[in-house]
Every structure is written in C-alpha cells, then in structure tokens.
Amino acid sequence: MKVWDLHCDTLSELRRAEKNGTPASFAHNDLHIDLEKLQAGDYMLQCLAAFVNLADPTPGVDPLVTALEEIDVFKRIMAKYPDRIAPVYTAADIRKNAEAGKISGLLTVEEGGCCKGSLGVLRRMYELGVRMMTLTWNHDNELAAPQANPGGPLAAQTQRGLTETGFAFLAEMERLHMIVDVSHLSDRGFWDIVEHGTRPFAASHSNCRALCPHTRNLTDAMIRALAEKGGIAGLNYYAAFLDTDPAHPEACRSTVERIAEHAAHYKQVGGIGVLALGSDFDGIDGHHQLETAADMPLLADALRRAGFTEDEVERIFWRNARDFFEHNL
C-alpha cells in the first residue's frame, strides 16, 4: 500500500542534531523517518516541514534563519540521495518520480511567522520550493492567531483570526498555488480562510474534535466546510490529539484502532474524499503504536478491520492526497 504523508518535523530534528554536533543521516537514523523507513513503508510522497518556534529561547535566534537552515537541510538531502528521493514542485514532478520508483519530497513550512509579514519573503519561499505553509504554529504572529495561548493552556481563539497582513498572505499564497494549511490556526482564522479564500486548502495534521476535545482538532462544522471547499485533512498520530484527555496526554493512547475511529468520523461527517494522512512524525513524543514510518501496514489493517473497503484505504493512504495536489499545486 502506497503512503502519502502531509506532515512531519524531520527537518527540524536533523537541523537540531547538526547544531548539537551529532549530525544524523537521512539514510538511517533513530528518528521516526529516514529513507530506510520510508522505503519499508512504501512511501510515495513525504511532506517535509521547515518548522519554526517563534518562542525559541536560544539567544540571537532568527525565525527566518531557522526556516532557511531547515530548507538547506532539505536541499542537501535531495542532492545526496537523488536515486532514492527527489524534490517535487509540480504535479508533473510527482508523476515523474513515481514512474522512476523514487520517493517524492515536498517542502512545506510550519509557522508563517518566519516570513515576518513580508510578501517578498513569502515569494522567496515559493522560489525555494515551499508548496504548503501553515499561517501559524502555537504563537501569535503578523498573520493570524493560533489555537494556543503562549505559556498557558491550549484554547480556541474564537474572536481573533487573520490580520490584514494575513489576508494579504492568503491572497498571495492562492495566486502562487502555495497551499494554505490551517492546522494550528485559530477557529476564527479557519473561518476567515473559508469565507475569504477561493481555492481548496488543507489541514495537514488535525483530527476530529468530536472524538477528542482538543482545539488542534477540527469541529464537525469545520470538517464539512473543508470538504465543501475541496480540501483535505491529514490524520495525526499524536496521542493527545486522538484520545479524550488533552490535559493529561500521558494517559492518552495512540493506537491504530483510535486513528481508524477518527478516520470513520471524518468519513461520516465530510465524506471519504476529505481523508489523508498527516503523521506529525518527529514532532510528537510519547508512545505510539505506529513507532516509525515503516509501520504503516498496521494502520492499513486497522482500517480494514474497522470496515473500510480496500478502495477507501487506498484513498486515505495516498489517492485523495494525490488528487488534491494534482489539482492544486
């Protein structure tokens, strides 16, 4: 079964290892994702995010520099292993890699604040290969409010959404065909995208709030709106986004059966076409039944046991995402 994953934080972990003087190989490492694991899991495409924490306490840290350094990690990986993985910028690139038996690497950004409110920087990100970006992570920025209170508990910021600059970014991202990713965005920000956006968008790594009352997840109304817009949502494997007690994530469970339950709810509310995978690998901690990218057959089997047909499992694993990017890159 082919796999298409909308989100991971592996670039950030590789950059961190380099900064710590213990560089890790992308061919084989102790992370959730490396080339060996991707090939063992039969991956067709992996979205690799340049992740930025605007509250990074490191002295002198610059969010734009952080993003550029992680993009540099991406570029070096693609140059080092050209026979096994290759970057993609268009739908044609994805088809070409599939025909050549190569994994596709699609560059994304997690935290639009790294652009510092500059449309020029946004356009430069596109030129560097970024094809999808979240407007926020867990901190307010020039573009929008997130689903988190910095230094406090996660809470839906229902009255604060996109800023004037955020709306300008939305328009420019749509012009460029850089996919808008609403994961981490506030509830009000989500509806700003629905009401003002003109193109399909993604929630790359978000689950169902009806099953797990965490503001990182989507309400049923959001799922329906996402589906009506032709968008897509990636199932996140993080226990606190799957189970029912976000205040005590250590008590939550990340099992393939629980992921399948979220998949079933997505299907019931938004239809099978809205579903994809968004692991959040290398950005999540705790115990997960899907320990690495090589374990994806476990999820396929769980979906079958939950009553999904073989056609539906394929759609969740790769075909819905393939069709979405085919029409929106």
Task: Tell where the protein language model's regions lie, with residue ranges.
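Conserved, mostly hydrophobic/aromatic
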Residues: 7, 38, 90, 129, ...
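Active-site beta-loop-alpha junctions enriched in small/polar residues
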Residues: 9-11, 51, 90, 110-112, ...
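Structural preference for beta-strand elements that scaffold enzyme active sites
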Residues: 2-5, 45, 86, 104-108, ...
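A metal-dependent hydrolase metal-coordination microenvironment
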Residues: 30-32, 36-123, 138-175, 188-191
